[in-house]
UniProtKB/Swiss-Prot annotation:
Record protein name field: Alanine--tRNA ligase
Lineage: Bacteria, Pseudomonadati, Pseudomonadota, Alphaproteobacteria, Rhodobacterales
Catalytic activity: tRNA(Ala) + L-alanine + ATP = L-alanyl-tRNA(Ala) + AMP + diphosphate
GO molecular function: alanine-tRNA ligase activity; aminoacyl-tRNA deacylase activity; ATP binding; tRNA binding; zinc ion binding
Pfam families: DHHA1, tRNA-synt_2c, tRNA_SAD
Gene: alaS
Length: 885
């Protein structure tokens, strides 16, 4: 019986033998399609090849693509654990042709792999084709010998695939497996097609047409193939299982869950184990690909998946965090096929543990609230939407988590009521995913790229070059010239200006032609085209002219220093904190650098000092910064760090700097920092000058941010700090080295004096320690007085002390300090039945022109504009007491 790992290898090896390039899975966060939340099929990474925007050095490819469907259009979350074939994470096996073979190649490949390599009996297979696709039907008859009744023609969109409203499209053929008459269900296209007897195992898409906005369609110049087969589904079939969760890989994770929770894997908690096994995969792979739990976008979907799994662990009786303990089992099962799991294992475990620890208390409270709400309802009644929203709004429970909990109780949620309460949040979420709205601008840059090709970048070797103005763009439209004072975007055939990418800001400088000059204020890059954002400062700039381009040297030098420093910083962080550290963002500007990295907690002062010291050690080493061009595979083999989320071509630049002890030339030692990077760098580490950390803060959940300075900016910062230190030393009359101890002593002294002052204020307010002489009104002793310099915070203890001395009676104190007037009152316990301190305060503040005041019957406090009418306020209090029986 083949394992799922065997099935994956068999698939990839088969197509590799048949001339296909084995391409590694792309990340779960799509690189080239902002409309997708997660990669959900094998063709996503090849989209630009199918549309002709991009070309590569192969025309046949095969992949095992990791996919997530949870959120957005493709959302399997609610059904996971309850059905045999729903998953949030799955692997899509696929083979692809980009203008190479077509139907007559794809169908024979599929049939041979299924019936020979996988050994599936031919009589167990049947297919569907689009109802007008006679070509595919004829090939199936010829290659597989299928009779007409086993080639089912489908007239619906189930067998016609479209990339979108416009673009490549075409018919498809789907291959089904017949589980036999003992399983209920009918063939595709029949009334009983939703049964489980006939299961789709492979879909072959024939991209042969292009759809236009007006509904017309034409044949594509380049016909392509896109196929997809779920590994879990074909693996279950080959292992003789009817349920994906019974396959070896999923069973291993289920048993790990059972061991961690001490719960029978096949007992009453079976569904819980299935949910945990599935969600462990999706959460771990998402974290490995750089997604961290948050309250918006992809991070929010990740958090929902994590919390759903954690609730099911809770239902199994788990009292402590469980999910992080299952990660080693996942790495054992899938780490060989996906090495990123092993590299990110520590980060995955720590993230899961922190999230589960935080959510545990929320979960307990929320489930108690849910039980309380259900107890109020008639037997079997659905939960009101307002209650479900309260769970979400107050306790962080997504709707699907509430629905999942209710599902086990045979209940549901009034979703209409919930939707009404959530309308505003959903509107914001839809707006966030609606797209950038830059279609017009994107079209012009696409046209320029089509006409002129990519801009050649010369900036690695020079800051000055000549070029030709290929295009001028204003307000999203091409123009022939731009005049003095106008803003314009300039495209040239070659440039020394670096276009913003990889955290490095774009260059600034000058572009001159024979008729004018323009000041470049920024440089961007899109689709290989460098866009110089400029203002014409002299004459005119015209399309087709020759141009002299010069980068601002001083600014570029500062950017280079900061960018090289981030490489040293990245490696220093990995060595100080662990290999889970990975870059999650950066800013390399001329005046500062910022570096975001994966780490779940704040760095200690000792760790920060270690990192800063190590970076400066390698700056002082003054080792050469070297750049080599190689394939991505060769770079990874050398151990080069890749920038998260960056798309790399067939060749990459690998930047190395720093030499570990004993690694000088000819000694066979190791390079300190080795990264894939397209940015510009210093020639030697010593050119950075020096490095000074200025802050370390949280950037997002599980993401820390370091800000730092280099070179002259770092020196200026140290001088500023040193100057302030010397100034403080002069003020406190101490040597610079003794400032800390001196300031600490002064702080202690100030605290002691403040306590003395507070005590003296209380004594003064009480008459300098002499016995207070209360006035008796209606049998109630009253002390009412005005005091100065006593703050509202100090009034409470003062009133309590005066009450204590009084024994029985009431106290009213009017105080003014720092421009704020406050009234405080107290009543001894034996009199609170006759008069309340709240009444006294409200009466006094009203006389002072204020409103309200509150507290307890024995002590209350309120504010007033001023004490100008203090005498009237005291009289009002006396009158109130006189009226009390």
């Amino acid at each position: 019986m083949p394992s799922l790992n065997d099935v994956r290898s068999t698939f990839l090896n088969y197509f590799e033998r048949n001339g296909h390039r084995v391409v590694e899975s792309s990340p779960l966060v799509p690189r080239n399609d902002p409309t997708l939340m997660f990669t959900n099929s094998g063709m996503v990474q090849f989209k630009n090849l199918f549309t002709g925007v991009e070309t590569r050095d192969y025309k046949r490819a095969t992949t095992a693509q990791k996919c997530v469907r949870a959120g957005g259009k493709h959302n399997d979350l609610d059904n996971v654990g309850y059905t045999a074939r729903h998953h949030t994470f799955f692997e899509m096996l696929g083979n692809f042709s980009f203008g190479d073979y077509f139907k007559d190649g794809a169908i024979p490949f599929a049939w041979e792999l299924l019936t020979k390599d996988f050994g599936i009996p031919k009589d167990k297979l049947l297919v569907t084709v689009y109802h007008t696709d006679d070509e595919a039907a004829d090939i199936w008859k010829k290659v597989a010998g299928l009779s007409d009744d086993r080639i089912i023609r489908i007239p619906t969109s189930d067998n016609f695939w479209q990339m979108g409203p416009t673009g490549p499209c075409g018919p498809c053929t789907e291959i089904f497996y017949d589980h036999g008459e003992q399983i209920w269900g009918g063939p595709p296209g029949s009334a009983d097609e939703d049964g489980d007897r006939f299961i789709e195992i492979w879909n072959l898409v024939f991209m042969q047409n292009e759809q236009f906005e007006d509904g017309t369609m034409r044949a594509l110049d380049m016909q392509s193939i896109d196929t997809g087969m779920g590994l879990e589904r074909i693996g279950a079939l080959l292992q003789g299982k009817h349920d994906n969760y019974d396959t070896d890989l999923m069973r291993g994770l289920i048993e790990a869950s059972a061991h961690a929770t001490s719960a029978d894997p096949d007992g009453p908690g079976k569904v819980h184990h299935r949910v945990i096994a599935d969600h462990l995969r999706s959460t771990s792979f998402l974290i490995a690909d750089g997604v961290m739990p948050s309250n918006e976008g992809r991070g929010y979907v990740l958090r929902r998946i994590m919390r759903r799994a954690m609730r099911h662990a809770h239902m199994l009786g788990a009292k402590d965090p469980v999910m992080h303990r299952l990660v080693p089992a996942l790495v054992r099962e899938m780490g060989a096929a996906y090495p990123e799991l092993g590299r990110a294992q520590a980060l995955i475990e720590e993230t899961l543990k922190l999230e589960e620890t935080r959510f545990k208390q929320t979960l307990d409270r929320g489930l108690r609230l849910l039980d309380d709400e259900l107890a109020k309802l008639p037997e079997g009644a659905n939960l009101p939407g307002e209650a479900a929203f309260k769970l979400y709004d107050t306790y962080g429970f997504p709707l699907d988590l509430t629905q999942d909990a209710l599902r086990e109780k045979g209940r549901a949620v009034d979703t209409a009521g919930f939707d009404s309460a959530m309308a505003e949040q959903k509107a914001k979420a839809r707006a966030a995913w609606a797209g950038s709205g830059e279609t017009k601008d994107a079209a012009i840059w696409f046209d320029i790229a089509e006409e002129h090709g990519a801009t050649e970048f010369l900036g690695y070797d020079t800051e000055i070059s000549e070029g030709q103005v290929l295009a001028l763009v204003q307000d999203g439209a091409a123009v022939e010239e731009a005049g003095e004072g106008q803003q314009v975007q300039i495209v040239v055939n070659q440039t020394p200006f670096y276009g913003e990418a990889g955290g490095q800001v774009g260059d600034t400088g000058l572009i001159k032609t024979e008729t004018g000059a323009a000041r470049v204020t920024d440089t961007k890059k899109t689709g290989g085209v460098f866009i110089h954002i400029a203002e014409v400062t002299l004459g005119t700039i015209q399309r087709g002219q020759g141009a002299q381009l010069s980068v601002d040297h001083d600014r570029r030098s500062a950017i280079r220093a900061n960018h090289s420093a981030t490489h040293l910083l990245h490696e220093a962080l990995r060595r100080a904190l662990g290999e889970h550290v990975a870059q999650r963002g950066s800013l390399n500007a001329p005046d500062r650098l910022r570096f975001d990295f994966s780490h779940a907690k704040a760095m200690t002062p000792e760790e920060l000092a270690q990192v800063e010291r190590e970076v400066n050690d390698f700056i002082r080493q003054n080792s050469p910064v070297e750049t080599r061009i190689m394939t991505p595979d060769d770079a990874r083999a050398l151990g080069a760090q890749a920038l998260f989320g960056e798309k790399y071509g067939d060749e990459v630049r690998v930047v190395s700097m720093g030499e570990l002890p004993g690694s000088g030339k000819g000694t066979g030692g190791q390079t300190y920092s080795l990264e894939l990077c397209g940015g510009t760098h210093v020639a030697r580490t010593g050119d950075i000058g020096m490095f000074a950390l200025t802050s370390e803060t949280a950037s997002a959940a599980g993401i820390r941010r370091i800000e730092a300075l280099t070179g002259q900016a770092a020196m200026d910062e140290l001088r500023r700090v040193d100057g302030e230190l010397n100034e403080i030393a002069g003020i406190v009359k101490a040597q610079a080295g003794d400032v800390v101890s001196k300031v600490r002593a002064l702080a202690d002294e100030r605290k002691a004096l403040a306590n003395e002052v507070a005590q003296l204020k209380r004594q003064l307010a009480m008459g300098g320690g002499s016995e207070d002489k209360p006035r008796e009104i209606n049998g109630i002793k009253l002390i009412a007085r005005r005091v100065e310099g006593v703050s509202g915070k100090e009034l409470g203890p003062l009133v309590d002390e005066m009450k204590s001395r009084l024994g029985s009676g009431a106290v009213v104190v009017l105080a003014e300090a720092d421009g704020k007037a406050t009234v405080a009152a107290g009543v001894t316990p034996d009199l609170t039945g006759r008069i309340s301190a709240v009444e006294l305060v409200q009466t006094a503040t009203a006389a002072l022109g204020g409103k309200g005041g509150g507290g307890r019957p024995d002590r209350a406090q309120g504010g007033a504009p001023s004490l100008a009418a203090a005498d009237s306020a005291i009289s009002a209090v006396e009158t109130l007491i006189g009226e009390k029986a």
